[in-house]
Structure formats: C-alpha cells, structure tokens
Amino acid sequence: MNIPPCAYAALDTALWDWHAQKAQMPLYQFLGLPSPKTPTSLTIGINPPEVIKERVEIIISNPEVKALKIKLGSPDGIEYDKLIYSQVLDSTKNLDISIRVDANGGWSLEEAKIMMKWLSERKAEYIEQPLVEGDEDKLKYLFEGRSLPIFIDESCRFSEDVSRHYHYIDGVSLKLMKCGGITEAVKILNVAKSHNLKTMIGCM
C-alpha cells in the first residue's frame, strides 16, 4: 500500500502526543528536548518585487521575526531571482535580520554556481536545495569551493538520505509532513548530528 508520508506523519505525531499526555509531559520534554527558544523565521514565496516589498513590510512589523527565507528558482530565470532578492535587501536594509535563500531545486548546476557567488556578496546566510531532487550527484561540484553553506530539503526525505549526501552538504532541512513524522525526524536529526551537520525544522 502506497501511503503518503503526510498520512504517516499524522498517525506518528498522534501516537507521540498520546504517549506524552499519558506521561503528563509536554511533547518536547517527553522527547528529551530543551524548552523551545528558537527565533522565528518566515518564508517569502516567489512574487513580483512590488509584492515582495508589501509582504516584507508586513512580516517585519512582527518583532519576533528574526530571519527571512526567500524562495528563488523562478521559472523566469536567475536575473528575475536577483530582482526579487534585491527588493528584499532594500526592504530590510536598516534592520538586523538574517536572510536565507531556498532555490527549491530551481537552478541548474551553472546557475547555482553563479547565484551562490552573487548571494554570498549580498548578506545571504546559506542556500537551500540549489539543485533539483535527483541531481544530488552534482552537489560535489557546488560543495568544493562553495561561497555559501549548502542545505538540502527535498533531497533529504529520510535518514538514509543524510548518510548518502553528508559529504557534500552543510546541513539539512526537515519537515514532518515530508519525512513521515516525529520518529523519522528524530532519526534524521541524530544522523545529521553524527556527521556534524546543521539542522532546521520547517513546516509545509
């Protein structure tokens, strides 16, 4: 039976929550994790620069937001990506806010090389999923001499993926709906930690 990971995630999370409630503990405590104190990062999708400007102004009005993740990899090409990112820079120029980039697998190898260098000169902290899922064999060409840390998202659905790709990445981005729930997420985090990789947890 082909059950989508999001269905597994719903069942898995419900089971973990049930066990935590039986133990009369918050789930994070039941999992042995510290109290959550992670600064909030919000994502801005691919949009025309004028829409980006409006959305950034709304988002940064929330003092809890300490970072923005910008979606690039536009079907209109990397020059359009540059316009989007430049608008974000302009809208946040007087703020102490981190800026990250998620290409969503929207670049070729050559485009990724160009954009990583360009972004590294313009405040970007890291690049997420620069290449399309399935092109992981090309990551080694980006990793050598990289100008930005490389995270993978779609290329890391399960803990086995971390073991396959850890040589050519700096971190992984995991999502419960993508990996099938808390059980697999904990495995991913443990494997990533064993390889000294950084980790992020996102939603979808």
Q: Where do the model's predicted regions map?
A:
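Catalytic core of soluble alpha/beta enzymes
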Residues: 72-204
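N-terminal capping/lid subdomain adjacent to the active-site entrance of alpha/beta enzymes
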Residues: 1-99, 104-106, 110-113, 117-121
